[in-house]
Amino acid sequence: MKSGFVSIVGRTNAGKSSILNSLLEEKIAMVSHKQNATRRKINAIIMHEKNQVIFIDTPGLHASSKAINQLMIDLAIKSIADCDVILFVASIYDDIIDYENFLKLNPKVPHIVLINKVDLADKKTLLSKLAQYNQFSSYFSAIIPYSIKQKFHKKILLDELVKYLPEHPYYFDPEFITTTNEKDIYRDFILEAIYENLSDEIPYTTEVRIDKIKELKTIYYINATIISSTNSHKGMILGKDGATIKRIGKEARVKIEKLAQKKVMLKLFVQLEKNWHKNEQNLKKILYDE
C-alpha cells in the first residue's frame, strides 16, 4: 500500500487542470483557455489499484510582477516542496525554456515530465520534442507523452507516479475525491463562467466570494459576490439589463449542479472594490481566506 502527494506544475495553459479532471473522471478544477485561470490549490484523490495518489493542481508558473500573480507563483513553488513527486506538465507546443526555468527552482523530489496534448501533433513533432527534453534526461525520472483523449494513458501515468510514492497508510478515506473546500470549488466554477463570457482583461481583475451556502435535502442555496476593480468592468459584468450576469449565473449553476448532484439556486451580486488586486493583504484575505 502506497499513499502520497503529487504536485502538478508547469506553465499556464499547459492543460494541468484538464489532466486532473480527466484522471478523476469528475470536474473539480477550473479549465479555461485564458492564461493563469487557476488561482487556488485544488486537490484530487485517486485510488489506483491499492494505492492512493493525491494530486495538487497549482497555479501556472510564469513571469509576472503583479501582486496577484506573484502570490499565485509563490503558492505553486511552495507546493513543490510539500510533495513526494512532481508532475511537470508541458504542452507539445510549449518552448523547452519553461522546463529549464522549472529546473532553476532546484526541486528536491523526483519529477516526471508529461508532454500533454500529443493528439494535436504529428509523429515527427512529437519525436522532435522528446529529443529536446532528452537533453535533460539526467534530471527527470521519466517522460510520458499524454493525451486526455486516450484512456490507456491514464494507467501508464498512474503506474509511473506510484513508483515514487512512499509506503504509507491512506491519508484520506478512499471514498473521497477531494478535500478541497466546496466553497473554493464553487467560486472557481463561477470564475470559470466569467472567463467564458467576458473579454480577456476583465477576469484578471475580478474575484468571487462565496457569501452563503445553505444545503437542504434536495437543493443548495448559494449567494456569491463578484468583486470588480472598476466601475466600467462592473457594468460589463452586469451587462445590458443584467443579461451578462444572468448568463454567467446560469452557466455556473449548471457546473455546480453537475458536481453537487442536486438542484442549485445561485444568486450573484457585483461589488466594486477599486484596485483590490494590487493590495497584497487584501489578496491573501480574498484568495486564501487568511
Swiss-Prot record:
The lineage of its organism: Bacteria, Pseudomonadati, Campylobacterota, Epsilonproteobacteria, Campylobacterales. GO terms for biological process: ribosomal small subunit assembly. HAMAP family: GTPase_Era. Monomer. Residues 57-60 are annotated as: G3. It is found in: Cytoplasm; Cell inner membrane. It is a peripheral membrane protein. Residues 116-119 are annotated as: G4. GTP binds at residues 10-17, 57-61, 116-119. Keywords: Cell inner membrane, Cell membrane, Cytoplasm, GTP-binding, Membrane, Nucleotide-binding, Ribosome biogenesis, RNA-binding, rRNA-binding. Residues 146-148 are annotated as: G5. This is GTPase Era. Residues 36-40 are annotated as: G2. PROSITE patterns: G_ERA (PS51713), KH_TYPE_2 (PS50823). InterPro entries: G_ERA_dom (IPR030388), GTP-bd (IPR006073), GTPase_Era-like (IPR005662), KH_dom-like_a/b (IPR015946), KH_dom_type_2 (IPR004044), KH_sf_prok-type (IPR009019), P-loop_NTPase (IPR027417), Small_GTP-bd (IPR005225). Residues 10-17 are annotated as: G1. Residues 194-274 form the KH type-2 domain. GO terms for cellular component: cytosol; plasma membrane. An essential GTPase that binds both GDP and GTP, with rapid nucleotide exchange. Plays a role in 16S rRNA processing and 30S ribosomal subunit biogenesis and possibly also in cell cycle regulation and energy metabolism.
